[in-house]
Amino acid sequence: ALIPSVIAFVQGNGDPSRYPMGFTIKADCKEEEKEFDFSKSLYFPQKQILCVNNHDILITHGHNEHIYSGLEQLYFKAQENFCKVVCYGHSHYPSNDYNKECTLINPGSCSLPRGGQPASFAILTAEDKFVDVAFIKIMESGFSLFNPVRFA
């Protein structure tokens, strides 16, 4: 069976929790007088848990889990939420870390890569019996698969 693509989004550090989708403009009002209609806004949660083909996947930005001090808090959050896969960001550094209970995936960054890594994103495939990740490097000439170097 063909399953549609799944898209999720979470709030990053410094991001507002809501983004207005529209605003009200009064006749002859100045730019600063526009009123945002927050009843029509996107809400960005701190985390999301998606179930894809019976795999619970935790999605979080990673700043609240203090990833620069290690990945232990991400492993703990996965265990706490009964997730076998965690997708996170914050470092803008692509990585695929795992232990016997959980896989941690950082897709890197399309616009602000760090640590000498290429601009990148990841495609996560969740089949019945396994989850696979492919890292895609963005180049001027197109796209290419690559294996990220382990985050140090």
Task: Provide a role label for each language-model segment.
Residues 46, 53, 81-82, 105-152:
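Binuclear metal-dependent phosphoesterase catalytic core
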